């Protein structure tokens, strides 16, 4: 009997670990809304926010298609400058929306409560001639439900017409949004990119995001803040949104668009203690050492650090943001001598490696 109980508990743990990560993947043409709702909503509920009601002759505004670059089926989010609107809401004619989300009628493990840490992952691709507006074109949001600040997202990825056009990472715990970092939109146009976003929800929270080109694994955007308010007062829960939500205030700057998305993932994760992280980091090694061209890292786990920094022997920080790719560091062109490579997690230095450039 005890053995049966043990086996049952072991299987239960395995099932919980497997079900902790929820994925949404396109599976081919047809029944797209039904597929999305089967994953992100409770039975007979709807998380799809589309402009079909005002553009019925086009049909469904989220479809599926086979993508030759990824060699798999993907989602296509369609938006038209006219006549698409925001779900036929009366009096709202200055914006249009085609989004999916989680919400109160989603399974509990798809919404974020105060104190939880959640990892969101997805892929997306803009057209090679994508045109943003000077107002806003949101393609991702982390938004609260409940409380006095529910109308404004805590985190937004928005596309903006500028010189040059750019992606903006925007943040607020209240109602005063600030831009944290930007990226030239040409880095995204015509490229599949993979996004990983980790949020520790709470007044003493943390936030990180990384965007890589999917086909080359090149990091083109990253941001991390280990100590930031990630909970809006009075909120019941927080949830993600993906798709196209854009202003029509400068409609002359816009065009009909298709934004492709793939491989959505929502996973609640347990954060290791700093001592655990240091133990994990003990196994990290670099080779060859000394080197004059490229250094590779062994036993590296990106979940165990927020950032990697490099310092020369005098303590001067060396920029390596564009030199670190696919667990390899390009050191060609560096002056000869001793350098220090530092792995950081939650502002704590969990590993320091000596690196000799010859």
Residue ranges and their predicted role:
Residues 277-358:
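C-terminal outer-membrane/trafficking sorting elements
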Residues 21-193, 199-271:
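Low-complexity, Ser/Thr/Pro/Gly-rich disordered linker/stalk regions
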């Amino acid at each position: 009997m005890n053995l049966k109980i043990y086996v049952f508990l072991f299987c239960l743990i395995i099932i919980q670990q497997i079900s902790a990560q929820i994925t949404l993947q396109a599976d081919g043409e047809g029944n797209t809304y039904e597929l999305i709702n089967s994953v992100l909503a409770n039975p007979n509920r709807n998380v799809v926010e589309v402009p079909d009601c005002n553009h019925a002759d086009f049909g469904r505004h989220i479809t599926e298609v086979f993508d030759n670059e990824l060699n798999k089926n993907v989602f296509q989010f369609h938006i038209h400058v006219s006549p698409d609107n925001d779900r036929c809401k009366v009096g709202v004619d200055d914006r249009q929306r085609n989004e999916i989300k989680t919400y109160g009628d989603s399974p509990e493990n798809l919404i974020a409560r105060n104190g939880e840490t959640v990892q969101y992952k997805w892929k997306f691709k803009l057209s090679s001639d994508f045109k943003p507006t000077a107002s806003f074109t949101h393609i991702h949001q982390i938004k609260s439900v409940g409380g006095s600040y529910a109308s404004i997202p805590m985190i937004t990825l928005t596309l903006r017409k500028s010189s040059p056009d750019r992606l903006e990472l925007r943040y607020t715990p209240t109602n005063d949004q600030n831009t944290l970092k930007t990226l030239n939109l040409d880095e995204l146009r015509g490229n599949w990119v993979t996004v990983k976003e980790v949020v520790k929800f709470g007044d003493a929270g943390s936030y990180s995001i990384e965007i890589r080109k999917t086909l080359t694994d090149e990091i083109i955007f990253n941001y991390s803040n280990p100590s930031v308010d990630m909970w809006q007062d009075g909120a019941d829960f927080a949830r993600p949104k993906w798709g196209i939500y854009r202003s029509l205030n400068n409609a002359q700057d816009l065009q009909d668009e298709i934004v492709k998305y793939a491989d959505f993932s929502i996973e609640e994760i347990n954060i290791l203690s700093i001592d655990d992280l240091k133990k994990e980091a003990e196994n990290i090694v670099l080779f060859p050492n000394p080197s004059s061209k490229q250094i590779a890292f062994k036993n590296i786990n990106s979940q165990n650090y927020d950032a990697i920094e490099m310092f020369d022997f005098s303590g001067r920080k060396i920029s390596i943001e564009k030199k670190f790719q696919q667990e390899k560091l390009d050191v060609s062109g560096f002056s000869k001598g001793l350098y220090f490579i530092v792995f950081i997690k939650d502002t704590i230095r969990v590993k320091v490696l000596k690196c000799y450039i010859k």
